[in-house]
């Protein structure tokens, strides 16, 4: 890479793999492109859950209102056929849904210790002179890392297994000396269908997959 940077983020690597041209526009040329409604919703929802789990918000709906306002102000959004008010109300519906609330309580607070939110990790890779950084959404008290997702439709087990992000987090945790018991990872998928729900996928990775991960990131760097 001919430009000077002092680190890579996992999100930038993921963006590059999806579309190199879009990555260049965003990270190198600094060209601002309209944000999608799905990204606005996901970011606001993600932040709301983290605020609540971190004890920084007494009410999920109050936190959602504040985060929605933050995400919708000061940036260009391509709403397309989506209606902002409907998306905002969908967030309220999800955060007041009794099944989702019960699942969150049973999933995040089943042990004596509180979950850890937004853990920064760094991964060093041979032939890549800068660290790869990322932030793990949640590490529950059983030491299993996890990631929050929002989706317009239900996930499948295969989709969860196809995600490369968990392998990066697990490799970074292992390198930094965190416990990685069984190389387990969880996805918490908040599905914004007519009847919303929370899906929890736990899957196991193989330490041997690290070499594939290293090779993939080395190719991105070159």
Task: List the predicted regions and their residue ranges.
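An N-terminal structural lobe/cap that precedes and organizes the functional/catalytic core
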Residues: 3-4, 8, 23-24
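Metal-dependent nuclease catalytic regions and adjoining charged, substrate-binding loops involved
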Residues: 7-8, 95-100, 128, 158-159, ...
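Nuclease catalytic cores
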Residues: 13-57
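Short, compositionally biased low-complexity segments
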Residues: 15-23, 56-76, 181-193
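Short amphipathic alpha-helical segments and their helix-coil junctions
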Residues: 20-32, 145-151, 218-222
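Hydrophobic (often cysteine-bearing) scaffold residues that line and stabilize catalytic clefts
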Residues: 37, 41, 87, 162-165
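A non-catalytic, helix-rich entry segment at domain boundaries
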Residues: 48-119
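Non-catalytic protein-protein interaction segments used by genome-maintenance enzymes to assemble
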Residues: 111-176
């Amino acid at each position: 890479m001919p430009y000077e940077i002092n680190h890579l983020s996992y999100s930038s690597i993921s963006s590059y793999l999806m579309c190199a041209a879009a990555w260049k526009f965003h990270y190198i040329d600094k060209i601002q492109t309209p944000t999608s409604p799905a990204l606005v919703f996901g970011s606001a929802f993600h932040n709301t859950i983290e605020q609540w789990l971190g004890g920084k918000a007494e009410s999920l709906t109050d936190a959602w209102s504040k985060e929605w306002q933050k995400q919708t102000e000061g940036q260009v959004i391509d709403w397309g056929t989506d209606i902002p008010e409907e998306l905002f109300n969908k967030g309220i519906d999800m955060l007041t849904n009794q099944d989702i609330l019960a699942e969150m309580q049973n999933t995040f607070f089943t042990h004596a210790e509180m979950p850890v939110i937004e853990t920064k990790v760094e991964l060093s890779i041979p032939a890549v002179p800068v660290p790869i950084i990322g932030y793990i959404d949640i590490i529950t008290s059983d030491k299993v890392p996890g990631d929050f997702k929002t989706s317009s439709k239900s996930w499948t087990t295969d989709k969860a297994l196809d995600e490369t992000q968990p392998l990066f987090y697990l490799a970074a945790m292992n390198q930094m000396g965190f416990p990685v018991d069984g190389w387990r990872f969880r996805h918490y998928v908040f599905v914004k269908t007519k009847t919303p729900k929370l899906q929890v996928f736990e899957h196991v990775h193989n330490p041997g997959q690290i070499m594939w991960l290293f090779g993939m990131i080395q190719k991105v760097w070159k």
